[in-house]
Regions:
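Pocket-lining segment of extracytoplasmic ligand-binding domains
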Residues: 4-93
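Short secondary-structure boundary/hinge segments and terminal tails
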Residues: 28, 45-47, 109-110, 148-151
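Residue-level detector of family-conserved "landmark" positions at structurally sensitive sites
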Residues: 38-39, 102, 141-142
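Secondary-structure end/capping motifs
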Residues: 60-138
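Conserved C-terminal helix/tail region of periplasmic/extracytoplasmic solute-binding proteins
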Residues: 129-159
């Protein structure tokens, strides 16, 4: 179920609860269709929420593109942190979400704008364990199987 589908489902009272990334919880609350009970950071500190992922194929066939993607991600994240109002306007414009809702969501959100994958490694490994225990994946993954930090390390060493 996508975020949009989940918002529709809770708005139509087809489900009793949803777990979604921001700004969806704020949208639901502002529309009077639910309330935020717990922030995801309260459930697991330093959890991985929205992450940059590239395929092994792209890494093998076009590492120079991956390098540029990582550099762009770092610059964009830093820009967002320094220009939150402008970032909110860009997001609202691209998604057609109400600007005030986006700004409120950014204030309520308990996450952090980060680029260093080391900060979410433990959370990602733990998430993998849960996915395995639920039978969604055939085995629990290690940090080394999930992360290739070489592109991040190279990008940050060139600053």
């Amino acid at each position: 179920m996508t975020s949009g589908d989940a918002i529709t489902a809770i708005s139509a009272k087809q489900v009793d609860a949803v777990f979604l990334p921001h700004p969806s919880p704020t949208v639901i609350e502002k529309e009077g269709n639910g309330r935020i009970i717990v922030q995801s950071g309260e459930m697991e500190a330093n959890h991985a929420c929205c992450v940059l992922v590239v395929s092994g194929k792209l890494i093998k066939e076009h590492p120079e593109i991956v390098e540029q993607i990582v550099k762009t991600h770092i610059k964009a994240t830093e820009y967002n942190k320094e220009h939150m109002d402008e970032a909110a306007k860009i997001f609202a414009n691209k998604t057609t979400e109400d600007l005030d809702t986006v700004k409120d969501s950014l204030k309520e959100w308990d996450g952090a704008w980060i680029t260093d994958p080391a900060l979410i490694e433990d959370s990602a490994v733990n998430y993998s364990k849960v996915q395995y225990e639920l039978g969604y994946i055939p085995k629990s993954l290690t940090k080394e199987e999930i992360f290739d930090t070489s592109f991040y390390e190279k990008a940050t060493s060139e600053k």
